[in-house]
Amino acid sequence: MCPHAHPPAKPDHGATTTPERIVHDEKAQLDFSRDMSYGDYLQLDAILNAQKPLSPAHDEMLFIIQHQTSELWMKLMLHELRAAIANVAADELGSAFKMLARVSRIMEQLVHAWDVLATMTPPEYSAMRPYLGASSGFQSYQYRCIEFALGNKNAAMLQPHAHRSDLLAQVQAAYEAPSLYDEALRLLARRGLAVPASHTERDWTQPYLESAAVEQAWLTVYRDPKQYWDLYQLGEELTDLEDAFRLWRFRHVTTVERIIGFKPGTGGTSGVSYLRKMLDVVLFPEIWKLRTDL
């Protein structure tokens, strides 16, 4: 060994890493008497005190949190959808693509959330069902706004919100506004594609009617992706979104059937039978049909 070399340092057994030492070494802030804390910023007191079970059933907490968290995700979904629609209307497709991709990922998150509720067995649900009254996810105003924003318009779906003028105003606004697909078709028309005026200047409150001319416009895009790259990408973003939405709906059906079978829903619908009918709704029909005709 070189005479000037230092021997290897011996481990300092007195400096054992502990949680306290890690926090000390990181200089983490511990006093929030004068600063906004994590809980303050997120308003956790309000959120975590919003679970008010009405029954003695242990599993009601799961039921409440499942639906409350779904409503939070739907709030974000609406935030992104509304911005995406505005961006498509303004020809700002780059921003719209990011927002639509986020909406699809939120829907995937909601698909997986059904796995948690599916741990509730029929007897467990039956123990709390009498306490639900007529309350039902069918009455979710945010979900109705999402359906309307995606083009599934139905005037009858305004009625469940008539008792709350503030909520009715939001649902009514979504009902009367152009949907995401309406704005996509208007964009195609602005780019010179032959979308008929019957589909670009119409009564937005009416259900969308499939059009052979609209399919031809999309076929033009899909037959030459290089020339119409951003419109082609828009078509695929819409496909991703509807694909995710179908999975979300399907998982809803299977979870409800697993828990209550074919009993009527608490909101007065036929339950699973009603949900199965909703699986047949196609939001962007021409984008799906063109795949056969390409």
Swiss-Prot record:
Family: Belongs to the tryptophan 2,3-dioxygenase family.
A molecular-function term among this protein's GO annotations: heme binding
Subunit structure: Homotetramer.
Source organism: Polaromonas sp. (strain JS666 / ATCC BAA-500)
UniProt-listed Enzyme Commission number(s): 1.13.11.11
Annotated cofactor note: Binds 1 heme group per subunit.
Name the record gives this protein: Tryptophan 2,3-dioxygenase
Alphabetized UniProt keyword annotations: Dioxygenase, Heme, Iron, Metal-binding, Oxidoreductase, Tryptophan catabolism
HAMAP family: T23O
A Pfam cross-reference name: Trp_dioxygenase
Biological processes annotated in GO: L-tryptophan catabolic process to acetyl-CoA; L-tryptophan catabolic process to kynurenine
Keyword Heme among record annotations: yes
Binding residues annotated for heme, in chain numbering: H252
Function: Heme-dependent dioxygenase that catalyzes the oxidative cleavage of the L-tryptophan (L-Trp) pyrrole ring and converts L-tryptophan to N-formyl-L-kynurenine. Catalyzes the oxidative cleavage of the indole moiety.
Protein's gene: kynA
Binding site for substrate: F63, I64, I65, Q66, H67, Y125, R129, T266
